[in-house]
Amino acid sequence: MSAIVDIVGREVLDSRGNPTVECDVLLESGVMGRAAVPSGASTGSREAIELRDGDKARYLGKGVLKAVEHINTEISEAVLGLDASEQAFLDKTLIDLDGTDNKSRLGANAMLAVSMAVARAAAEESGLPLYRYLGGMGGMQLPVPMMNVINGGAHANNSLDLQEFMIIPVGAPSFREAVRWGAEVFHALKKIIHDKGMSTAVGDEGGFAPSVENHEAAIQLILQAIEAAGYTAGEQIALGLDCAASEFYKDGQYVLEGEGGLRLTAQQWTDMLATWCDKYPIISIEDGMAEGDWDGWKTLTERLGQNVQLVGDDLFVTNTKILKEGIDKRIANSILIKINQIGTLTETFAAIEMAKRAGYTAVISHRSGETEDSTIADIAVGTNAGQIKTGSLSRSDRIAKYNQLLRIEEDLGDIAFYPGRAAFYNLR
């Protein structure tokens, strides 16, 4: 038995300089697991609640001392003595202790820090790398990275409404090569932006945030960079968008300030997205409609769902109840998996499993406020998710995940598998 003998929560900083929760879990054997939780900027309204102190005199109200106190008191009392290898039972203990539907009493940030740290401690105790502990012998598929090279929306201070413009190395023979391709395109894009006299400063997720004329201009910059780096757009490197459409959905219309204040119905917005998909090698669109616009989602799915991955982030918030409703109504065809949207590892794995059973893809994701914690890299391989979003090819909080995946690929050796385009298995 891997008995938990001590738990310590603490307040640390995330990549935006805001407080977040870190937790250490000590086992009877002397083994320790440590984990830190991320935080989002554009968030779904039905996400599990991240507990903040609200004291404006301290960290502008964003302190997490209440969440830390819950770890060091109530949660500690409830889980001391439990077997760290019983992850599902431990997570259920946390859920029952909180007693709310959205984890608002203890805070999803407190609960997730404990859930992750326990898994790390148990993996260390078992002598297994985390990805192997989480996934057993079946975890051997590296994820296709969706690399956010141009930022807009809530992640940048420019005129772009869409939040992320991503490159996806679908033609790479291995994860290591996919990272190399991405890095080379990133540097080619930097030179192009610089040569055009625009800023090469990066946003929260490490992508550039140039002030361009419109959204197609951003796409064309990326296509130029792919060509300049020596690759073929579409065949070797595809494109992905994260619209984060809830952020520009106002009074029942999609208001695109980056397109001159254009106001579109869901049908008109679908038509615009479809035009872009016909014109450019776009194979994935995340949050193409607002989270509450299920009729719009239905329209988008019927129009593009056979040929484009339509990812629900704010739509599904890693929640199996909402995902099941979406599956039943044939809304979207993919789910974004963010561990802090739901608050425990067990619930995260349940969402991934439900998606796969329904023929939906599952994309493991970071948040815009990250830490050096690389747990999501291990989750991506352990669950054979097939895809990961963890930012651009800069900022150590993003690179930490890529580097961990490179280590995992090396550890797997000849059995490591990079799916490439096959990761988008639900598309024609």
Curated annotation (Swiss-Prot):
Q: Specify the pathway.
A: Carbohydrate degradation; glycolysis; pyruvate from D-glyceraldehyde 3-phosphate: step 4/5
The reaction(s) this protein catalyses: (2R)-2-phosphoglycerate = phosphoenolpyruvate + H2O
Which SMART domains does the UniProt record give?
Enolase_C, Enolase_N
Q: Which GO terms describe its biological process?
A: glycolytic process
Q: Which CDD domains match?
A: enolase
Q: Where in the cell is it found?
A: Cytoplasm; Secreted; Cell surface
Query: Active-site positions, per UniProt?
Result: E205, K338
Provide this UniProt record's keywords sorted from A to Z. Answer: Cytoplasm, Glycolysis, Lyase, Magnesium, Metal-binding, Secreted
Q: Which organism is it from?
A: Acidovorax ebreus (strain TPSY)
GO MF terms listed in the record are: magnesium ion binding; phosphopyruvate hydratase activity
User: Which co-factor is required?
Assistant: Mg(2+)
- Which lineage ranks, top first, belong to the organism behind this chain? Bacteria, Pseudomonadati, Pseudomonadota, Betaproteobacteria, Burkholderiales
Q: How is the cofactor bound?
A: Binds a second Mg(2+) ion via substrate during catalysis.
- Its gene is eno
Gene3D superfamilies the record matches: Enolase-like C-terminal domain, Enolase-like, N-terminal domain
Query: What biological function has been recorded for the protein in this entry?
Result: Catalyzes the reversible conversion of 2-phosphoglycerate (2-PG) into phosphoenolpyruvate (PEP). It is essential for the degradation of carbohydrates via glycolysis.
Pfam families referenced in this protein's UniProt entry, alphabetically: Enolase_C (PF00113), Enolase_N (PF03952)
| Record protein name field | Enolase
What the entry lists under PANTHER family is as follows: ENOLASE
**According to its UniProt record, which protein family does this protein belong to?**
Belongs to the enolase family.
Q: What is its EC number?
A: 4.2.1.11
Give the main localization category: cytoplasm
Record InterPro entries: Enolase, Enolase-like_C_sf, Enolase-like_N, Enolase_C, Enolase_CS, Enolase_N
Write down the SUPFAM superfamilies for this protein, in alphabetical order.
Enolase C-terminal domain-like, Enolase N-terminal domain-like
* Annotated binding of (2R)-2-phosphoglycerate, by residue: Q163, K338, R367, S368, K389
> Which superkingdom is the protein from?
Bacteria
**Chain residues that bind Mg(2+):** D242, E286, D313
- Entry's Gene Ontology cellular component terms: cell surface; extracellular region; phosphopyruvate hydratase complex
